[in-house]
Design a protein with these regions (language model features):
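Cysteine-centered catalytic environments shared across enzyme families
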Residues: 1-335, 346, 549-550, 555, ...
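Generic recognition of stable, solvent-exposed alpha-helical segments in well-folded globular domains
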Residues: 19, 236, 240, 244, ...
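Adenosyl-5′-phosphate
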Residues: 1-3, 22-23, 88, 165, ...
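Active-site adenylate/phosphate-handling loop in enzymes that bind or generate adenylated species
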Residues: 348-410, 499-522
Length: 662
């Protein structure tokens, strides 16, 4: 992966625009530590920091050809097939890079080329003939792209921190964005947690012209216009899943640098590592996270799978102190409040990967969303059962079956709370947004910490209107579980997991994550399968488990799902007492200075733990600890001056000014 920046329609002198690109890129150097370059044209300027993966010699950016310029963050995995298609149409190529294929395809087909790309990317494409700048993002929002209008120009960047280099500008937290992010774990549409900064939506392109208003094109929407369910048997679906997933892995192994795998110990990464092993002829490395705290540790299963495949397993052992000491660094890279500490071990793992000489890793990300592995899918079925059979004696057993990894639900008092929770939703179990409502219900505890003037009078109506604006036209034709998949992908996956835990943490150390389960052909096919193939009764990821049952250890195939988590509130205690980081960032003075939370409410929360760590901490307190602390860290970091370099320190491979040359 890489990092990109751009300036459009600025009225400054060319040399001034070139000078501004440099400090913007310096703030993104971690995304592309190998090389950097800039190009300045008439009314437009583009910059790029490169993580070299394909065509290491000739793939430098900005890439220029035929009056077109491209800066591009990501990969198009089917570039070999696209190259052959374009050559058959009479096109010729000067390099082996996928970057040139993307540029030629965009020049020839315009925005329609985006639907031909199988990959994860964000890009800025300047066409001098039409004098238009196209900004585009991949189907599922794997790679970020932001834009900001300021003093007559539009600025673009892979991360918002690059905008802090703009004269007379400083990022500030948007209260509405913070509220929406807190309730949904994401902001919807183009909104971000920062005032004035917009995120390009996944699956869209925006075309900026010198004399016209920007035009937005949506080239992809999950499930839109897709007939379902597909005909065919479960046995046929297993064969097809294996074939399509193997092809997704094959495409994502294309690289001119070494490729490794993440191995968590769950079935998702075990499958991608298995298929990698089948497709490769050489021995490769797998990387894993082990925890000092046995409640989170899955190293037994990681070692089992590594031994089964005879791969080299490299592990990092995570302690509470490592989480605590690296929390602020993770927040700086994430650029948003965190709801848990899970990103920090991934940040540290990426450092180990880079030190091992690996720049690309395949992971099992997104399998839970597309194959229905989350508890949320089972919760919907449980709600339906409770509504239909209100007097069933199976209710207690169903709750314990639903949450086997949460030991405290075995306690009678906790079960009573769970029963009240579910009964409170019985009247709306058939509401098409009930899955999202469950998450919002859990997160409304955050409202106790926000000033009252930050909340809309009709909060539920405001939020539901925001959600419904993002729904596809044929939404009502989908099953309830398909609707929940869409909502999970648009909120939790796209806005949080792919950003805070994936893109930002891996690229903090110049490591590109690739996600076979997000292959769009695979995902669209799975979306059309009958619901019972993916979740019969309460059997999560049933199709995936049965497809690979013969190839994986039964202990991995049949083990209850253990969500990837890390110690949250517990990690911020030192010597049995609440530690320095929490006490300083959540002090009354610090909270008042940031002006985002009710200082008295935050002080009551901190006071709950003044005497030490309680024996049990629930979901809400863990979530609150991470959210309150990380929001305060974001606010503090926004006030800190940049002390890094004024330009990237790697070799400059492109430096062109095509307007006002001296």
């Amino acid at each position: 992966m890489c990092g990109l920046v751009g300036i459009f329609a600025g009225n400054s002198a060319p040399w001034a625009r070139r000078a501004l690109l440099e400090p913007m890129l310096a703030r993104l150097q971690h995304r592309g530590p190998d090389a950097w370059g800039t190009w300045v044209g008439s009314g437009v300027a583009l910059g790029h920091v490169r993580l070299s993966i394909v065509d290491l010699v000739a793939g430098h950016q900005p890439f220029l050809r035929d009056d077109c310029v491209l800066v591009y963050n990501g990969e198009v995995y089917n570039h070999i097939e696209l190259r052959a298609e374009l050559e058959a149409l009479g096109e010729h190529f000067q390099t082996r890079s996928d970057t040139e294929v993307v540029l030629v395809a965009l020049r020839r087909f315009g925005s329609q080329a985006l639907a031909r790309f199988n990959g994860q990317f964000a890009l800025l494409f300047w066409n001098a003939r039409t004098r238009t700048l196209t900004a585009a993002r991949d189907r599922y929002g794997v790679r970020p792209l932001y834009h900001l209008e300021h003093q007559g120009a539009v600025y673009f960047a892979s991360e918002t921190k690059a905008f802090d280099a703009i004269p007379n500008y400083r990022r500030a937290i948007c209260p509405e964005g913070l509220l929406e992010h807190g309730l949904l774990w994401n902001t919807l549409g183009t909104r971000t947690v920062f005032k004035g900064i917009q995120s390009l939506e996944a699956g869209t392109a925006v075309v900026f012209g010198a004399t016209e208003s920007p035009k937005t094109y949506r080239y992809h929407q999950l499930g839109e216009g897709t007939p379902h369910p597909l005909p065919g048997s479960f046995a046929e679906a297993k064969v097809q899943l294996r074939s399509m997933l193997a092809n997704a892995v094959r495409l994502r192994l294309r690289s001119d640098v070494p490729v490794g795998n993440y191995l968590s110990g769950g079935i998702d990464s075990s499958v991608t590592t298995l298929l990698t092993d089948e497709l490769r002829t050489d021995r490769f490395q797998a990387f894993a996270i082990a925890f000092e705290d046995g409640a989170y540790d899955e190293s037994h299963y990681q070692q089992m799978m590594a031994k089964r495949l005879n791969v080299d397993l490299v592990s990092i052992r995570i302690t509470d102190a490592l989480i605590r000491d690296n929390f602020e660094k993770a927040v700086w890279h994430a650029e948003r409040p965190l709801f848990r500490t899970a990103p920090i071990p991934l940040l540290l793992l990426a450092e180990v990967v880079r030190a091992a000489g690996i720049r690309v890793v395949l992971t099992g990300e997104a399998a839970d969303e597309i194959l229905w592995g989350y508890d949320a899918f089972k919760e919907l079925k449980l709600l339906r059962f409770w509504a239909k059979f209100p007097n069933s004696k199976l209710r207690p057993q169903l709750i314990r079956t639903l949450y086997p990894h949460l030991a405290h639900y075995r306690d009678g008092r906790q079960f009573g709370l769970m029963r009240m929770f579910y009964e409170g939703f019985l009247g709306s179990y058939d509401n098409d947004l009930v899955g999202l409502n469950l998450r919002v219900h859990n997160n409304k505890i955050l409202l106790n910490y926000l000033p009252r003037d930050c909340r809309p009078a009709d909060l539920d109506g405001w939020l539901l209107d925001r959600v419904r604006q993002s729904l596809p036209p044929d939404w009502q034709q989908w099953s309830l579980l398909r609707k929940n998949q869409f909502l999970e992908m648009r909120t939790l996956l796209q806005g949080y997991l792919l950003s805070s835990q994936a893109d930002r943490m891996s690229l903090a150390h110049g490591v590109e994550g690739r996600y076979p389960f997000l292959d769009h052909e695979l995902l669209e096919w799975l979306f059309q399968l009958p619901d019972q193939f993916k979740l019969p009764l309460l059997s999560q990821k049933h199709l995936l488990r049965e497809t690979f049952r013969a190839n994986l250890p039964s202990e991995i195939v049949d083990r209850p799902k253990q969500p990837y988590q890390a110690p949250d509130l517990k990690a911020f205690f030192e010597g049995g007492r609440l530690g320095k980081l929490m006490n300083e960032r959540l002090s009354p003075d610090a909270v008042a200075a940031a002006g985002l939370f009710d200082a008295a409410a935050v002080e009551r929360f901190r006071g709950k733990f003044a005497r030490g760590m309680p024996p049990q901490v629930g979901y809400r307190d863990n979530m609150l600890a991470s959210f309150l602390l990380s929001t305060q860290v974001v606010a503090a970091q926004l006030q800190q001056p940049w002390t890094g370099p004024v330009r990237p320190s790697s070799p400059r491979t492109v430096d062109l000014i095509e307007e006002g040359k001296p």
